[in-house]
Amino acid sequence: MAPQSGPEARSGGADFVVVANRLPIDMVRRADGTTEFKRSPGGLVTALEPLLRRRHGAWIGWPGVPEDADDPNAATEPIEQDGMTLVPVRLSSEDVAEYYEGFSNATLWPLYHDVIVKPIYHREWWDRYVDVNRRFAEATAHTAAEGATVWVQDYQLQLVPKMLRMLRPDLTIGFFLHIPFPPVELFMQMPWRTEIIEGLLGADLVGFHLPGGAQNFLILARRLIGATTSRGNVGVRSRFGEVQFGFRTVKVGAFPISIDSAELDQHARSRATRQRAKEIRAELGNPRKILLGVDRLDYTKGIDVRLRAFSELLEEGRIDPEDTVLVQLATPSRERVESYVAMREDIERQVGHVNGEFGEVGHPVLHYLHRPIPREDLVAFFVAADVMLVTPLRDGMNLVAKEYVACRHDLGGALVLSEFTGAAAELRQAYLTNPHHIEGVKDAIEAALTQAPEEGRRRMRAMRRQVLAHDVDRWARSFLDALASKEPVEG
């Protein structure tokens, strides 16, 4: 069912609107039942805040807590925060279960990540996904000023561009996908494949991390809806593809996302961070080498791969448990989804096995924390670590790899990086590895641990040039310039 258009949709005053599943704040329930809002920092917020303030901008999203229809404390009114208007979209417990945990994270997420876990296709989840996307589109239509620019974010909202186009044809609409876009043969499994492609084609510009995702989308537009598309290769921030859809031309491009690298670089150089890094090394027993993994607890991240590789290197005597430790920081994630619960149990069994085999009383060889880590501690861990392990089976970009590089102004450290991350296309001087080949992962870890100091500095210097030059601000500018049909940022 299509959203209804009408003059009442044209009532907003925001010239620039960001639409995302989550608001850049978290709603917290107090003990007395009232609510407060806490800022939720992130790279996207950092990049877009100045623009939102300058252009009377609004951010539309869910505050993060399920709210049922009879909830007297429900967030329904716009919130003014730091010069931005935040517009909450209310989701009930059923919405969260079926739209978010269901269709978004048990259907789309595994399908888009190479079917590492089998996607589940429930019609009820799809119906809820359509309904929630419609609510986001309607909230946007009521918020955006005449002729405004709207930037829709990520896989949870792939139907919003078309719905919004029907409500507000005056708007300029961009869409960016923050996760990988799958190969054609995998996407074709989706029962609602045509609806998804048509939903995205409501945008004026559809953006992906890498040219490969853009090429896949162009093929699907031809195959599923018979659209005429450009045939040449899509470039990075240049050479856009095109889809002729009705009377409109939709641009398709690749825009690799990044981080606020200058801020991280500055943070890592501070006296407090350097002191905390020394304390971390001391708390770990001052080992000769520290390996580090930092991930959301997700089956795509390859945490089990690196634990197995580490265990086998210890078994084979290629790593000495007396002077090397692995620290795995795992942020809790999607704890009500069955596949995530099973994965956590498996990883924690592996941790117990490694420490049981190779640790000593008071000296575990593998330190595992399953909780959120404060930002200042995380930066100190990056500064302290000799080898960063980033081994996803599939990842749209992986910003942790870039964060580690941004924190290494000393040109120390080494990065072991999966070939199946978007970051691998940019950080070519990392120790690249195929996470499906355990011997290759072991060899990469060993090479990183034993690299000559000058070789390590050469690699880190080259990666830092890339990360510091291509920051999150440049990513946002390149996308929005392309959306406004200005000359794209090259390189």
Curated annotation (Swiss-Prot):
A GO MF label: trehalose-phosphatase activity
EC number(s) reported in the record: 2.4.1.15, 2.4.1.347
Main EC class the enzyme belongs to: transferase
Keywords: Glycosyltransferase, Transferase
A Gene Ontology term for the protein's cellular component: cytosol
UniProt key word Glycosyltransferase: yes
Residues that bind D-glucose 6-phosphate: R22, Y100, D154, R334
Self-association and partners: Homotetramer.
Family from the record: Belongs to the glycosyltransferase 20 family.
Name the record gives this protein: Trehalose-6-phosphate synthase
Gene this chain is encoded by: otsA
